[in-house]
């Protein structure tokens, strides 16, 4: 999904205006982050505007995009950051196609300790 790749580029570049456009402009849009629970596009935009642009580079792993029909998709990925050794990030997004293009309607981001190899 091209929109997911474009979102990722905007995220690591801290392109706040683009990130704001990627989230559905609705009071029902939700983003559960590592340390914040954001309800509505306005809260998500305020979080993005205040966030430090440092340390956003990351490497994606095991990205899976599953579509349901032509207008709904789930994007799930793992990520790692050089600034957080021993940690594994997880991100899941619900995408909906609107008249303006694909938008994130709900997102969840969490970070866990790196699983030990067995």
Can you name each region flagged by the protein language model?
Residues 1-14:
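Short, aromatic-enriched amphipathic alpha-helices that serve as compact interaction elements
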Residues 7, 19-20, 40, 44, ...:
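Hydrophobic pocket/interface hotspot
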Residues 8-9, 33-35:
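Second-shell loop/turn segments in exported
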Residues 13-28:
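Short, well-ordered alpha-helical segments enriched in acidic and aromatic residues
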Residues 38, 81-82, 110-111:
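Short, surface-exposed beta-strand-loop junctions and turns on beta-sheet-rich folds
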Residues 88-117:
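Short beta-strand edge/turn micro-motifs at domain boundaries
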């Amino acid at each position: 999904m091209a929109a997911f790749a474009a979102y990722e580029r905007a995220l690591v570049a801290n392109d706040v205006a683009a990130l704001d456009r990627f989230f559905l402009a609705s009071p029902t849009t939700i983003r559960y982050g590592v340390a914040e629970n954001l309800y509505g596009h306005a809260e998500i935009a305020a979080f993005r505007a205040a966030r430090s642009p440092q340390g956003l580079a990351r490497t994606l792993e095991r990205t899976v995009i599953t579509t349901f029909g032509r207008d709904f998709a789930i994007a799930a990925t793992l990520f790692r950051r050089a600034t957080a050794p021993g940690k594994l990030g997880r991100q899941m997004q619900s995408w909906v196609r609107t008249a303006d293009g694909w938008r994130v309607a709900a997102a969840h981001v969490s970070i866990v300790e790196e699983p030990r190899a067995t």
